[in-house]
Amino acid sequence: MLHTANPVIKHKAGLLNLAEELSNVSKACKIMGVSRDTFYRYRELVAEGGVDAQINRSRRAPNLKNRTDEATEQAVVDYAVAFPTHGQHRASNELRKQGGFISDSGVRSVWLLHNLENLKRRY
């Protein structure tokens, strides 16, 4: 019998416990509204890593949308430290003159990422 306080795992553990109690996987799956394939996947996870292995894991790598490359990001941080009084628009324009391309909002995003969003933090 499996016990857990985690609400994500509770349903899955309940399915496994019900199947054990009824001694019938098909009936337990019908009652809980899941497929038998799902039941066997849950059971395999428990066999491999215990009850805590049932926590949902994303299969995808995180998609960081509009993430600037490291060189541009470092250029923005260096510029912000060198010229803390310049705003995001002027910083973007000056970086374009130096050969890089980053939008105003891109500069702002990099500042937020590095905790440089206001003048006091850039000094």
Swiss-Prot record:
Domain of life, source organism: Bacteria
Alphabetized Pfam families for the sequence: HTH_29 (PF13551)
InterPro entries: Homeodomain-like_sf
Name of this protein: Uncharacterized protein YlbG
Originating species: Shigella boydii serotype 4 (strain Sb227)
